[in-house]
Amino acid sequence: RVCTDQACALKGADSILEHLCQHHQIQPGQTKTDGSLTIEYAPCLGLCDHAPAALVNDEAETDISTDLHHYDLGIPTSRVFGNLRELTANCGNGRPTLLAEYGEYSAFQKALSMSPEAIIAEITASGLVGRGGAAFPTGIKWEGARQAPGTQKYVVCNTDESEPGTFKDRALLLDDPHRVIEGMLIAGYAIGASHGYFYLRGEYPYILPVIEAALDEARQAGFIGTNIHNSGFSFEVDVRLGAGAYICGEETALFESIEGKRGFPRIKPPFPTTNGLFNQPTVINNVETICNVPLIIEKGANYYRKIGTDKSTGSKLFCLSGDVTKPGVYEIPFGVTLRELMEMAGGVRAGRRLKAVIPGGSSMPVLPGDIMMQTDMDYDSIAKAGSMLGSGAVIVMDETTCMVRVLERLSRFYHMESCGQCTPCREGTGWMHRMLQRIVDGKGRAGDLELLRSAAGQISWTPASRR
């Protein structure tokens, strides 16, 4: 499965796919007559820092070149940079951090000495907001779930980072799984939950053994199970592997998937804090959000608020990919400019000029490079510039990039990944992609641009996309 989404395309993925097909004498989507090989297009695999990339069965093939005659398959190494190491202190070492190295869950043990109300108050005071894209205040979410009636409550770790250009959660899960587990335990204790779930994206099968091994370590150490360390608090954790649907990154579609149903978003309200997984009160946070929790409980809200800006507190993990010299995960405080971030990353590769940037994942508006270079990397500044911070996936495009081809490629992704629940999106994304293909092929028609605007407007107001 060869990724041909934007980050990999900028590194020559189309040529790699063509080379493979010519070598094996089959076309994309076809299988060799002996059944030994199938070659497929693939949407973003979360390997953008190792572009161009592919999955061979369940193993990652990274930094592919047509010059290579032998490929090393396995687990990708995290490339972690930046001027902070609060969340990424244990990342970038090329292997998972063991419990003996991570420590005895000191933040969780401190949390057990606090009241649930005090924990939620500390999270609220820190200013932590969701890092998956919505930026909803975490403390408010937790308080809503705690106050909701119900004897069975859940904590769900959304590890389905399917937004093209995003790969930070992959690094956290591969390199520091115990930080994620500890954050889930604290969340469970705070809201009164007794069960947690990891929902792992289908393109990350190689992470599953890492999570399972870390959970086994935590169980053997008495941090998961019944009456944990004689505290009266019990908590179990299970893992569910998704099937690769982009829509299951949406929280309620994710619940449907865990429950064994088709991944359709639910109508809101009611919200997950009252009617979530199995219709019970649920806190769902993404990996990066949960990894902030042990830090806040261990060092306090005041320490946390000193990082970042007044309105965007803490650090942020940015995923730099595309036409950048050093792609990878960068942990920086909110408020650092893109210019500073690009300097850390060695600038635009090959000494070219910056043309455009997608600042927060492929569903965010594209901004011109000159505007982005003067923009602070925080929620308010990106919004004022005309886009959104989203998941923090920064896709860099140089002066050689054709923006019409970029749009055509993005439209293909959203056409392929539409959940199909609403007709304007199910059909409209196909119309848009076909029109853009015509334009890219030099066969554009008068009125195409107006039709594109009209279709985009109708899709944006479909019921599911407004939830």
Name these PLM-found stretches.
Residues 1-467:
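Feature of Fe-S/electron-transfer and energy-metabolism proteins
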